[in-house]
Curated annotation (Swiss-Prot):
Note, other: 'Golven' means irregular waves in Dutch.
Changes seen on gene knockout: Dose-dependent altered root gravitropism associated with an altered PIN2 traffic that impairs the formation of auxin gradients, thus leading to an irregular waves root shape.
BP terms from Gene Ontology: cell differentiation; positive gravitropism; positive regulation of cell population proliferation; regulation of root development
Region (Disordered): 144-163
Tissue: Expressed in roots, specifically in the root apical meristem (RAM).
Gene symbol of the encoding locus: GLV3
Species whose genome carries this gene: Arabidopsis thaliana (Mouse-ear cress)
One cellular component term from this protein's GO annotations in UniProt: extracellular space
Protein name in the entry: Protein GOLVEN 3
Length: 163
C-alpha cells in the first residue's frame, strides 16, 4: 500500500510541475493570464481570419472537452485527500494525506515532509518467486481452464465405442 501511495504522489507531483511550466493545455473558456488554453488568444497566424479584438467574442470550445476539463477541475477542488504545496526556495515538499493509522476505519490527517524526492524509498516489484511461478503457470498453453480436471463419465453414460 505504501508503494502505491508513493507512485500516486510522484504522479501528482509530475502533473503539478507540468502545470506550473504551462506545458499542459486545458480546454476551458478564459484561462489565467499567460496560460495556454484552447480558447482563442489572438495569435499572429490567425488574427486576420478571426479577429477576437474586433468582435470581443470568445471562441466556442468543443462541448466534450470543456465539460471534461470542468469536471476534472471540480473533482480536483473537491478532493480533500491530497493537497500539495511545493516551495522552490526551501526545496521541500509538504504532502498532506489521509493515512490509516489504526486497524479500524478511523483516519487522521498527517503531514509527511519530504526534503528531497530522492529520499523516498526505491520502488521495487512486489512479486515473489511463488507469484511468478503462478503467473508462468497461468500463461502456459496447457494450463486447464477449469480448476478441477474433468473426470471420466460413468460407464453407463459413455459412448458405445469407448468401452
Amino acid at each position: 500500500m505504501m508503494r502505491f501511495t508513493i507512485i500516486v504522489i510522484a504522479f501528482l507531483l509530475i502533473i503539478q510541475s507540468l502545470e506550473e511550466e504551462h506545458i499542459l493545455v486545458y480546454a476551458h473558456e478564459g484561462g489565467e493570464a499567460g496560460h495556454k488554453s484552447l480558447d482563442y488568444q489572438g495569435d499572429q497566424d490567425s488574427s486576420t481570419l478571426h479577429p477576437k479584438e474586433l468582435f470581443d467574442a470568445p471562441r466556442k470550445v468543443r462541448f466534450g472537452r470543456t465539460t471534461r476539463a470542468e469536471k476534472e477541475q471540480v473533482t480536483a477542488m473537491n478532493n480533500d485527500s491530497w493537497s500539495f504545496k511545493i516551495s522552490g526556495e526551501h526545496k521541500q515538499t509538504n504532502i498532506l494525506a489521509d493515512h490509516d493509522t489504526t486497524k479500524n476505519t478511523f483516519c487522521k490527517k498527517m503531514m509527511i515532509i519530504v526534503n528531497d524526492l530522492t529520499s523516498l524509498p526505491t520502488l521495487e516489484p512486489s512479486t515473489s518467486t511463488n507469484d511468478m511461478e503462478k503467473l508462468a503457470r497461468l500463461l502456459r498453453d496447457d494450463y486447464p481452464i477449469y480448476s478441477k480436471p474433468r473426470r471420466k463419465p460413468p460407464v453407463n453414460n459413455r459412448a458405445p465405442d469407448k468401452f
